[in-house]
Every structure is written in C-alpha cells, then in structure tokens.
Amino acid sequence: MATLDYQNRDDAARERKGILRQLFGPCQKEVWAALAAEIDARYEAGGWWKGSRVVAEVGPWQVTLDTVRRDKLVFTRLRAPFVNPEGFRFRIHRRHLFSGLTEMLGAQDIEIGEAQFDRDFVIKSNDPARVRQLLASPRMRLLLDWQPRIHFAVRDDGGWFGAKFPQGVDELYFECIGVLKDHELLKGLFDLFAETLEQLCIMGSAYETPPGVTL
C-alpha cells in the first residue's frame, strides 16, 4: 500500500498494523499478554529457541500455555504436572468423521450416561468408573463443551525433548492445532485445568502437593 504524503513513517506503520489487525485479528503476543494480566499469570516473551508462554499458579500447580511444532504444524498446548498416586489416565476428544469406524474396529469409547455429552465426545480411560466420576461434575462437562477443538488427557512426561518427571508425576495435557488466540477460549482452558485438578484431588486421584518439576 502506498504511503500517503501527509503521513510520517510512524503513521504509515500504524496504518499497516491496523489493516493487518482487521484482516487477521490481534496477534498472539497481544492476546496472551492480556490474558496473563487478567488471570494474574506470568507472560514470558519468546526468543529464537523458545516460544512465548503464559504460566499461571493454580494452588500448588503450574499451568503452562505455549505452542509446539510437530510435523511442520503448530499446536497450542496447556500442561500441568501433578502427583498422580494411582496412575489414573484418560483421554477426551470431540467425536469426528472417523470415530464410528474406530469404534467398529474395537476402540474404547466410554459412555457416562449424559446423552448429549456421549454423542459429542469420545472418552478413553484405564479406569472407566473413575472417569465417569470425574465427568459427573456439570462444570467439567460445561468447560469441555465450551471448547470447539479439544484433545484433553492425563499422560506421562513429554519424552526425549520434554521435562523428565519424577516417579508418580504425570501431566494434565491439552492441545489443538494452530495458534489459539481467542481470549475467552483460552481463559476457559485455564478454568478447565483448575476445575479438573480440584476434582482429581477430591477423588483422591491427585495430591495437593507440588509435583517437583518445572516445564
């Protein structure tokens, strides 16, 4: 776009930024920094080797929002290590086109007795009774349903390139493809993590003690 004669260079830069904002919305830094300020978290700007992230203290746990590249794709993820005394695992994602096929091939899909939730989500766990107890919370189901794209799980450490977890420590994990810049969805994810950790403690599936690992 040509610079108008009456504009100085700063005016032109602001105009270009305004047009880009109209086309693509606010940038990741702007959204994540505002989110951190609202939820009393810490925004950490990225550099050459490490991307930006938001770190929130939730009781004895740290919930970390960042991005990761995998197979030339970018994913937004949230992670929260916690003490998992019984090794409870689950994985929840939205039902998609091929979900029915995988069920026909014998893939696990636990039903919790809530018709709409069972219709919309695929649930896997090493303890079906316990995951039903977790999802008996209406707030848990509401926070999960709020997310249009979700892969939510308890898993062990991130392998060779991630932090190594002590014995008995696992992490609550969320990811979706792309860079998530929707303020309300991001805020809802932090609420989801806080609610899940609280429910796991009530169930005896998490301890309210620091996990002894930093991401």
Region spans (language model):
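Charged, low-complexity intrinsically disordered regions
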Residues: A2-R21, Q28-L215
